[in-house]
Amino acid sequence: RVIRNFMIQGGCPEGTGMGGPGYAIKGEFSQNGFRNPLKHTAGVLSMARAMNPDSAGSQFFIMHKDAPHLDGSYAAFGKVTEGMDGVNRIAECRTDYSDRPMKEQKIKKMTVETFGVDYPEPKKV
């Protein structure tokens, strides 16, 4: 999904926006009892989920613009530090009535910098 001035979403293994990895992980955000101070500002990555707070799997979204109403309700986990022009380009693409891009959009390269911290695998539920 691509919603200009809000976010771009990816990570569906089927490419439909409805798929997942076959498991779910615990939602790491304050309304679910997990301290997570990262705010949903432009460039922040967060886990997409269904209504169930523990339903995230492989889908994620990147904030195109600030969305403070998501703070504490979704598991923000990273931030775009280079290449925000690519996020902006995707956010400006033409979409259909379901917010799906008219032309396929792909992230060609992504690097995750953990700054030497070894994070445990998320708890599956």
Question: What label would you give each PLM region?
Answer:
Residues R1-V125:
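Cyclophilin-like peptidyl-prolyl cis-trans isomerases
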